[in-house]
Regions:
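A short beta-loop-beta micro-motif enriched in histidine and acidic residues
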Residues: 79-88, 99-111, 115-116
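Conserved metal-binding segment of the jelly-roll/cupin
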Residues: 95, 153-179, 183-188
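Double-stranded beta-helix
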Residues: 129-149, 173-227
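A short, N-terminal "cap"/entry segment at the start of jelly-roll beta-barrel domains
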Residues: 1-88, 215-221
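Glycine- and acidic-residue-biased ligand/ion/polar-headgroup-sensing regions
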Residues: 95-96, 108-110, 114-133, 137
Length: 227
């Protein structure tokens, strides 16, 4: 991804949050320069757990078609006495017709919620023991406490206010229809480095082309602050 696209995506995310009257924590507004002025000893939880902005094109090179804007608000670390939270929380911003590709989580259970905007469309399929796609097995999920069953690959539509619980090893892909969607993720501890499996090769964190100065550091770039 180009740095200019990342900078613009975070600027746009701030504007969208304001439109939906969603208030964000202070660190969501720290520019790269502002981060350098902070006492990092006071922000160890944010830096160590990579809370903050996460803009990705999943290695596909076309953010408008395949991409996602995330803000990790809370997280923990398994087995850590310093960060014992067993849960995580993220804001998701999904542009109209922008998709997140097929993937599952090996350990994490999560709820994905449509907080407002258009329709959040999702397709589901169980993973096979060798991490393939099980096209035959029926998928049963809970949508706001109501049991729903869908065929593998069938589209489940979440209207604003609806959410679905996704257990581990359940492949899912999703996109927004009719309008932009403000999404939310409530989950077990999140580990994007080790817990994600994508059906097709790609990348969770994008390679970045530095075509303009860094305005917003991504959560995966906090090591720059040590330089």
């Amino acid at each position: 991804m180009k740095r200019s696209h990342i900078n613009y995506a975070v600027d746009k995310a701030h504007a969208i949050a304001e439109t939906f009257r969603v208030c964000l924590p202070d660190f969501a507004y720290f520019t790269a320069d502002a981060w350098r002025q902070q006492d990092h000893t006071l922000w160890r939880e944010v830096l160590d757990l990579q809370l903050g902005w996460d803009i990705t094109d999943f290695g596909r090179g076309d953010f408008a078609q395949t991409g996602l804007t995330l803000l990790t608000l809370r997280n923990g670390q398994l087995g850590s006495a310093s960060y014992p939270k067993p849960y995580a929380e993220k804001m998701l911003q999904i542009q109209q017709d922008q998709q997140t590709p097929w993937h599952f989580h090996r350990h994490k259970m999560e709820d994905i919620v449509n907080r407002g905007g258009g329709d959040l469309c999702m397709q589901l399929a169980w993973a096979t023991p060798d991490d393939g796609y099980d096209a035959r097995r029926i998928v049963g999920v809970s949508v706001d406490g109501q049991r729903r069953s869908v065929d593998a690959g069938e589209t489940l539509v979440l209207k604003p206010g609806q959410g679905v619980c996704l257990p581990p090893r359940l492949y899912h892909r999703f996109w927004a229809e009719k309008a932009f969607v403000l999404g939310w993720e409530i989950s077990m501890v999140n580990d994007d480095l080790h817990d994600n499996h994508f059906l097709e090769p790609g990348g969770r964190f994008p390679a970045i082309e530095e075509d303009e100065p860094v305005k917003w550091l991504l959560c995966s770039e906090y090591a720059r602050l040590q330089r």
